[in-house]
Each structure stands twice: as structure tokens, then as C-alpha cells.
Amino acid sequence: MQKKMTKNIFNWNHVSEKLTEDQISELKALYKFYHKKYWLFKMTYKYFKKAELTCNIGSVLLIVTGTVVGGVTLNPAVLGSVSGAGLLLKTYSEIKNYKRKIEMSKFAYTSYAKVLTDLRSFMRGLNYNEKEYLDYVKVLDELIIDMGCPLTDKFEKRYNKVFIQ
């Protein structure tokens, strides 16, 4: 049986000679930390997109099926029960507030993608001001937490399987 290979997140093709070893190790640690946040929020975004799509398609199918079958059979019980189930599914989707969760997850993962791009640029030689940049990412983290972005704990095991093992 073949051992599954893990993916390497450090895919830089150039590291600037201007950086000290301490700066390189710090940038790699930051990259590792924010790559995990990026990946977890991206998976959360995909999960909520699929959940919303499933609820919407399911509710439409139930409502249309109930309406057609109820109209053909002239049986109001079928119309009410099947269409009612579709309306319940639509209500469930609205109560779960998937649209907001999708927006928040997308904001979080695109923000962290920008952080990863910045860190790669610093590794390639862009001027790196440690204090200024750490203040920036701290404010970004606090903003994402304050906005109430959905938790990403359910994907952490998969991240560890893909990138860490």
C-alpha cells in the first residue's frame, strides 16, 4: 500500500538574500499559521455554498413536485404535505442564514489569501517591516473574529491529514 504524500505549502521559487535567518523562519511560521486559516475558511466557504445550494434545490423540487402531483391528482393533502416540506426546507435555509455565512467565509479566506501573497512577496525581497505588518494582521484577525465568521473546527482534521502528517 502506498503512503499518501502530504502537500508542501512552502512553494517559493526565490528567497531574498537581504533577509536574515530569523526573518526567514518568522515569515515561514507566519505563512504556516495563515495558510491554515486561509484553507479552513475556504473549506468553510465551500461547505456553506453546497449546503445553501442543496437546500434551495431541494425546496424547489419539493414545492414543484407537490404542486404538480397535487394538481394532477386533485388531492390537496399531497399538495399541502409535499409543498409544505419544501417550504420547511426553505425556511430552514433562511434560519441557518447561509448567505451571511457564505459572505463572511469568503471575506475571511480572501483576506487571508492576501496575507499569504504579502508573505510570499516579503520572502522574495519586498521591504518587510515586522511591527507594522504584525499590527496589520492582528487588526485583520480581530476584524474577522468581530464580524462573526463561522467556525472552521470541522475541517481542521482534514487540513492536518493533507498538509501536516
Describe each model-derived feature in a short phrase.
Residues 2-61, 91-165:
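Conserved non-transmembrane functional hotspots
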Residues 68-78:
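Membrane-interfacial hairpin junctions
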Residues 54-68, 81-88:
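Membrane-active amphipathic alpha-helices enriched in small hydrophobic residues
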Residues 77-80, 84, 88, 108, ...:
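Amphipathic alpha-helical interface surfaces
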